[in-house]
Amino acid sequence: MRPEDDRVYDVIVVGAGHAGIEAALAAARMGFRVLVLAVNPDTVGWAPCNPAIGGPAKGVVVREIDALGGEMAKTTDETMINIRMLNVSKGPAVRALRAQIDKILYSRTMKRKLETNPNIVLRHGIVEKILTEKGKVKGVVDNYGIDYLGKAVIVTTGTFLRGKIFIGRSTFPAGRMGEFPATKLTESLIELGFEVGRFKTGTPARVLKRSINFSVMERQDTSDEPLAFSFFDEPRVLPKDYPCWLTRTNPETHSIIRQYLEFSPLYGTVKLIEGVGPRYCPSIEDKVVKFKDKESHQVFVEPEGRDTEEYYLNGLSTSLPYEAQIKMIRSVKGLENAIITRPAYAIEYDYIDPRQLYPTLESKLVENLYFAGQVNGTSGYEEAAGQGIIAGINAALKLRGESPLILKRSEAYIGVLIDDLVTRGVDEPYRLLTSRAEYRLLLRHDNAHLRLAKYGYRVGLIPKWFYEKVLSLERRINEEIERLKKVAVKPSDRINDLLTSLGTSPLKESVSLYHLLKRPQLSYSTLKFLDPNPMDDPEVVEQVEINVKYEGYIQKMFEEVAVFEKYENYEVPYDLDYDAVPNLSTEAKDKLKKIRPRSIGQAMRIPGINPSDISNLIIYLDKKKQ
């Protein structure tokens, strides 16, 4: 590399958290030279809050990232110490994996993957300014005054934009505990026209393992079933060396919290925190204030890794003073002698209004400037990583001169996430939930590769052999379903006795294995006794069983998707003059001008746009086409 090339790159990624990692790796693997600027290169992919990946909806996102060619699932498999499948009894639409990771090893592994990629340079630097020229991004300036030039810039700053930590009435600037904040970049974004807001989040205290009495807590071991996040990895059973533990708060805990509320930066007499916090991950003082009737709340005591004695107190996030934290924690069963190694804290930070972005995550204000992760108003490692890979892919595709990758709401949770952000915006930290996805029975944990591998292959992040494997799987699933339709089972005493013993009604006439499998009491494995040629591939069997048992619901959902696609494919010109559209309400005009929806479908999802506005818009567009 020539010395002058050391400051010139194709893509510059600002930040090396979960969004930055996926963005950098995607762009680099698609053939572009990438610079990653991190406040601290030793905390790449850090898990500053819970040491876990996955959970409802979020676990599906991890698999979607994997199907697109991302890294989060693989690194989770490499570093996990405890893994479980959640919501097994609730059906396939809401099942999801959640793994405890060794957070130190996870970070080291991700750093290594960035450093060993020949197209990536990982470097320390706090970005202070975005450079632009004629409405197009040109590069960045760091805290040393160094100009780095890039054709595209991806901002993934997490909680670092003017980050401020709160512990009681003590407050100090930080991107997270022990790390410098980015104090000047927000000013640069505001100068470029970006609307900026303020959110807050928090994390619990960490306590020393030897000070915990696990004997009075409920043990939660890793799964007995072989599991893996990545479709590229072989599922395995982990040793039961790192269980999680469940305990609960009690009335004494809540009394201590109420006693110290006046010193809370959120509820105290001196209100220090103005930012809105996450609804679905409230602090313990939030729970005590808002749910006065609850006598206890769950606390999960989780290991942070193999080579550390620190445990994470999931459920005890707080910004109360240190003295209050000690008393509160020691009032909990099993934590009576707990030694705090790191105090809990709240952190307030800047985010941009994501309605200023296209669905590609490119800014509407500055060409080739992308944003991903918490800077867009989301919460969660998985949500950040999902945005990161999309931003990285789209930055690379634009530099190639190719069409962007925009995942629909009917295709992926990542599509739901990004559409919600750019269409509806955020007034609190956004967390993905299964309830946000209208088509969640189609967006399952088990079929992410069947849904998305084609896109990963198209952009060059998925190898040909894996894509062919997915196509083969799809073919074998369809062939097996057709075979089951053709295999008839005739009534007999033996068969009817078997069916009765399984809790289902006996046969009165010949019926196919396909129709028998629809019965809720029967599974593919129980039908093996009636099947002359059963399939032994568990992946095929799982897909066949879900598709047969839920056929009616799935078919209905596909019909709904067809209606959805009709409006999604009805394009709205970006430069449409909404003032020229007759009979549009003033509110509709204002919101349509701000969002500039790419389709009628997206316009329909903008809050405040009513059906008559949509009808008037369609009438106007139809007339323009004539």
From Swiss-Prot:
Binding site for FAD: G15, A16, G17, H18, A19, G20
Cofactor: FAD
A cellular-component GO term for this protein: cytosol
Compartments it resides in: Cytoplasm
Single annotated GO MF: flavin adenine dinucleotide binding
A GO BP entry: tRNA wobble uridine modification
Binding site for NAD(+): 277-291
Keywords of this entry: Cytoplasm, FAD, Flavoprotein, NAD, tRNA processing
SUPFAM superfamilies: FAD/NAD(P)-binding domain (SSF51905)
Assembly with partners or alone: Homodimer. Heterotetramer of two MnmE and two MnmG subunits.
Family assignment from sequence similarity: Belongs to the MnmG family.
Known role: NAD-binding protein involved in the addition of a carboxymethylaminomethyl (cmnm) group at the wobble position (U34) of certain tRNAs, forming tRNA-cmnm(5)s(2)U34.
The protein's name: tRNA uridine 5-carboxymethylaminomethyl modification enzyme MnmG
Organism: Thermotoga petrophila (strain ATCC BAA-488 / DSM 13995 / JCM 10881 / RKU-1)
Classification of source organism: Bacteria, Thermotogati, Thermotogota, Thermotogae, Thermotogales
Gene transcribed to yield this protein: mnmG
